[in-house]
Amino acid sequence: MAYYFGAVVSELNPAVLPLDWLLGTWQSDEPGEGSFPSITPFRYTETLHFSHVGQPVINFMFNAFHAESKKPLHRECGFIRIQPGTNRVAFIVAQNSGLVEIEEGELTGQQLTLHSTAVARTSFAKQPYVQQISRHIQLKPDGRLEQTVSMALEGQSLTQHLHITYRRTD
């Protein structure tokens, strides 16, 4: 039995059973590192929530805060789907910055490697515009979750932007 916002829901849908290692709440175990050629490097903390309601998708919500000032940074929410009968995975993401993306890739054991196949933004999004995103999430042998995000902006090639590790808190 699983819980979602206090309500009891059905068992995990078999379609997303290969992603059960993500379920729960994860908190950064130390501040992550953010950098990009066009910004001042920064440190951040982040909480990840992965849940389900018995459908063939995993729901997620990511909340990041500046490590020193504690000001809110990026917020991401969305869904993870698996193409039935394959290891093909899709991340469908909406960010508080007005960016929406679809990332697709592969699930290999307990790691996800994803690359954007579509990136859209609000008409008044901040420039330079994000053109491409890649994400690597893996469960380490010590039980920590690690995430690395790279991005490309207009006129800049794909470059690592974020790196952080988490510990499960529930």
Describe these PLM feature segments.
Residues M1-V57, M61, F65-P72, D142, ...:
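Amphipathic/hydrophobic helical signal segments and adjacent flexible N-terminal regions
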Residues S28, I58-F62, R88-V93, L112-S116, ...:
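Short hydrophobic/aromatic-rich beta-strand segments that constitute the beta-sheet cores
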Residues T45-S51, E76-R81, I102-E106, Q132-L139, ...:
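Hydrophobic/aromatic beta-strand elements that line small-molecule binding cavities or substrate pockets
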Residues V53-P56, G85, L107-Q110, K140-R144:
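Short, solvent-exposed coil/turn segments at beta-strand boundaries
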Residues H66-A67, S97-L99, A120-R121, L153-E154:
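Short, surface-exposed beta-strand-loop junctions and turns on beta-sheet-rich folds
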Residues A67-E106:
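Helix-adjacent hinge/juxtasegments
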Residues G98-L99, L107, T113-S134:
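Acidic, glycine-rich flexible loop segments
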Residues F124-P128, T148, S157-T159:
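Short conserved catalytic/interaction loops centered on acidic-Pro-aromatic/His motifs
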